[in-house]
Amino acid sequence: MAEEPTYTTEQVDELIHAGLGTVDFFLSRPIDAQSSLGKGSIPPGVTAVLTSAAEAKSKPVAAGPVKPRRKKVISNTTPYTIADNIPPEKLPINTPIPNPLLPLARPHGKMTDIDIVTGNITEGSYKGVELAKLGKQTLLTRFTSNEPVSSAGSAQDPNFKRGGANRERARGNHRREWSIAWVGDQVKVFEWCNPRCAPVTASARKFTCTCGSCPSICGECEGDH
């Protein structure tokens, strides 16, 4: 059985001094990532043999050509277009805002107004008054679950829909149209005539005949102003 080696105090101090010198040497210089060895590259076993093999494997890599680093191209263009937060032009105090259903340049027709507070109704056609009453009832009950008392001029009434069947309108080859709007405390119903061949739009517009068989004035629109 071989005897264990013994070291004197001077030999131990010399080994410690050499080890500390090696540590100071590597700490005083930058570490090259290509030549440094991680723990994952040294499998368990005879450390001296495996370490030498790993170092020999890393030397060709260090001696190989160094790839140039790619320069990061910084684009000067903004990827997003930022909208200007310009405040809208403020209207003077008490400036009325036009209702889209009641344009300023509306065609000739009849206007029926009903005041919700007083219940006063301006002069208008029978159908306009009925629709104004329906508009008032709808406005007062729009946030409740109560059913309307009367269906006159309601969605169940075919005459309420623009272009609905009507014998008088069929004779005149005109289509009577209505536009209901709520302006303040008033319900406004505007009515006018359009040729039957004209398209149905959401705004109060006057169209001209395109089929050549519609008269310019019918029995319903001859009294419009």
Curated annotation (Swiss-Prot):
Q: Which InterPro entries match?
A: Paramyx_V_Zn-bd (IPR024279), Soyouz_module (IPR025909)
* Region (Nuclear localization signal) residue spans: 65-72
Please give the Pfam families that the UniProt record associates with this protein. Soyouz_module, zf-Paramyx-P
Name its cellular compartments: Host nucleus
Give Gene Ontology CC terms.
host cell nucleus
Coiled coil segments of this chain? none
Q: Where is this region: Disordered?
A: 145-173
Key words, A-Z: Host nucleus, Host-virus interaction, Inhibition of host innate immune response by virus, Inhibition of host interferon signaling pathway by virus, Inhibition of host MDA5 by virus, Inhibition of host RLR pathway by virus, Inhibition of host STAT2 by virus, Interferon antiviral system evasion, Metal-binding, Viral immunoevasion, Zinc
Report biased composition (Polar residues) as residue ranges.
145-157
GO biological process per UniProt = symbiont-mediated suppression of host cytoplasmic pattern recognition receptor signaling pathway via inhibition of MDA-5 activity; symbiont-mediated suppression of host JAK-STAT cascade via inhibition of STAT2 activity; symbiont-mediated suppression of host type I interferon-mediated signaling pathway
| Key word Transmembrane present | no
Q: Where does Zn(2+) 2 bind?
A: C197, C209, C211, C214
Q: Which residues bind Zn(2+) 1?
A: H174, C193, C218, C221
Which one of the record's GO molecular function terms can you name? metal ion binding
**What family does this belong to?**
Belongs to the paramyxoviruses V protein family.
Q: Self-association or partners: how does it assemble?
A: Interacts with host IFIH1/MDA5 and DHX58/LGP2. Forms with host DDB1, CUL4A, STAT1 and STAT2 the HPIV2 virus V-dependent complex (VDC); this complex targets host STAT2 to proteasomal degradation.
Descriptive protein name: Non-structural protein V
Q: Which organism is it from?
A: Human parainfluenza 2 virus (HPIV-2)
